[in-house]
Amino acid sequence: MKKQICILGSTGSIGTQALDVIKQHPDRYETYCLTANNQYMKLAEQAREFRPAAVVIANEQHYEALKALLADCPEVKVYAGAKALDEIVEAQPIDMVLTAMVGYAGLSPTIHAIKARKTICLANKETLVVAGELICQLANEYRVNILPVDSEHSAIFQSLVGEGRNEIDKILLTASGGPFRKFTLEQMRDVKAADALKHPTWDMGAKITIDSASMMNKGFEVIEAKWLFGVSADRIQVLVHPQSIVHSAVQFSDGAVKAQLGVPDMRLPIQYAFSYPDRLPLNGDRLDLFKQPLEFFEPDMEKFRCLQMAYEAINQGGNMPCIVNAANEIVNEAFRHDRCGFLQMGEIIEATMQKATFIARPTYDDYVASDAEARRIANAML
């Protein structure tokens, strides 16, 4: 039986690479549903090629245009809106949901998919950043597997396969360091979005590329790792590794370290989440260790305040990571549209952390309210 896959965010970087994986294994996987936020033309194109049972465009303004583009594909049902996203993931035939949407918007459909007992292939890290405790509780309650798609978390996951109950001493989470690794604070003050969008080793969407430049992305990955692997933040060490060959590693209680290495290719962790515990053939480049040295550096927390703030947020707990995520989404977008300086992003996030209402034991409704409040506060400072 082919696995039926729903891709939330099929037009983005992860979504398009996931479709490439599916294309390479048509005997194993089938797309049941594809979704997008605004890119209705690309979504229609994908629907024509992969013929899913349904497509959902989150922005309802594009519904009629999408419907018209797929008028000659009556077997593809067209839906629109956030509610449709929540409902489609519950469809009975779906086996796996790949959450490749960007940002807070991924939270609600992920919760619905868990409650419908679908296997979650998690690429939307913000879901665990915002509501990690709630998501883990639900996954336990509904006995749902969450398989990481982020290259680093996939590497940690792969390093833990076969380890059973063996105790983790610490997690070594690697980071490329982004395009400004060697910049001084003065130089960083003047950088523009175009500079930040030139990532040295990975090809990603705009939002995550900016988060990588500020190292907020790595901060979010620390939070994600805490929830996925049950390891406290003080046992998650970030290593700047410019070559992006060692995707992450785990040190065990006997001092042994297991790591996963490979060329920077997101299709590998996507495919492993789809095929786990099996490994399938995948076309593409192979690692050549003779090509370059492997270097590791300590991150500069003064220069990259966003990474430090993520550690502070997880140590505070409660809704603080949710507040940080909301403020970050606002300043990230503002920076991309030249309405906010690069270092100003961190300043606004820090001020939002101080001003927003802290809730030690948040419910789902608290997360929704905290997200809205933090966005208002951050917006007011732009």
State each model region's role.
Residues M1-L382:
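Catalytic, metal-anchored helix/loop core of enzyme active sites in primary metabolism
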